[in-house]
Amino acid sequence: MSTTVEKIKAIEDEMARTQKNKATSFHLGQLKAKLAKLRRELLTSASSGSGGGAGIGFDVARTGVASVGFVGFPSVGKSTLLSKLTGTESEAAEYEFTTLVTVPGVIRYKGAKIQMLDLPGIIDGAKDGRGRGKQVIAVARTCNLLFIILDVNKPLHHKQIIEKELEGVGIRLNKTPPDILIKKKEKGGISITNTVPLTHLGNDEIRAVMSEYRINSAEIAFRCDATVDDLIDVLEASSRRYMPAIYVLNKIDSLSIEELELLYRIPNAVPISSGQDWNLDELLQVMWDRLNLVRIYTKPKGQIPDFTDPVVLRSDRCSVKDFCNQIHKSLVDDFRNALVYGSSVKHQPQYVGLSHILEDEDVVTILKK
């Protein structure tokens, strides 16, 4: 583990010393690719157990339809926020390193059961295996949404450190995968096409990165103005995690109105005061929007719909088959068709099959054989 960390440090030092220009672009491309491979090595050893794994007390049994991880430095108010939202008591105090294990809680919001995980305070250097940060990050990667909780008295400083740590282990916040297609070939060399001008990336850098990954023949199609980091992300796709995140700017009760107005300009941010219960409703609504959950109401044949207890599905898994499996797996075996009311169908109601994609607040009657 220490050898990998030392190699990473050596490459970072060399990159810092190297001035970027046309003559050095090939060399810098190779260094960036080497760095990405070493970071993957570090992450793999941390998650497999040779470097500590998730660790006792870090990972917890999952429950609910989605999970939200609380990430932040010690004593920014994570434990207080968890307690206010879920009623779960996590030890909270005004000194650092209070929470030493992952503390789970559950909130029921708009009929959905959502698990919230108060992770131990992430610290600078976590991406290099220092402290307990790598175990915290291993759990954070498995969440559906991250609350990056910041103290408003020093938001930008801590925000930049946390983003750097998460970037270093392959977590991409509020981003989508780069639109780059790579098709490997047996021969013919590297051919590069682009549908938009590439203002951040030259052919030398592209060939250097591909060479480092031992890919000598491939067709590469750029459909976005990519950087060398974007190209590496596509090559390292299996170790990348694209996650929505909300920057929770806590302790706003210490600010003036003018200062508060400035905070609202930060993208993907929600200012709150967990201690004073300020703006928690807005935080939950933004959380709901970012989780992209779908509520489906059941309507037994010949009865009125049950609007009190929806079946909640993820937006990427919301077919009629997913709905049936959520209720009971035997429903799929006995399924004849479904009668759906709502925005997912043209006619009200309409008969559909198992592959039909449901939308939020549809009403469904399952008809058996």
UniProtKB/Swiss-Prot annotation:
It comes from the Eukaryota. One of its GO terms (biological process) is positive regulation of cellular response to amino acid starvation. The modification N-acetylserine is found at S2. Pfam families: MMR_HSR1 (PF01926), MMR_HSR1_Xtn (PF16897), TGS (PF02824). It is found in: Cytoplasm. The keyword Nucleotide-binding applies. PROSITE patterns: G_OBG, GTP1_OBG, TGS. GTP binds at residues 72-79, 118-122, 250-253. Residues 292-368 form the TGS domain. GO terms for molecular function: GTP binding; GTPase activity. Keywords: Acetylation, Cytoplasm, GTP-binding, Nucleotide-binding. Residues 66-292 form the OBG-type G domain. The keyword Cytoplasm applies. Associates with translating polyribosomes. Interacts with GIR2, TMA46, YAP1 and YGR250C. Belongs to the TRAFAC class OBG-HflX-like GTPase superfamily. OBG GTPase family. Present with 11700 molecules/cell in log phase SD medium. Involved in ribosomal function. This is Ribosome-interacting GTPase 1. The lineage of its organism: Eukaryota, Fungi, Dikarya, Ascomycota, Saccharomycotina.
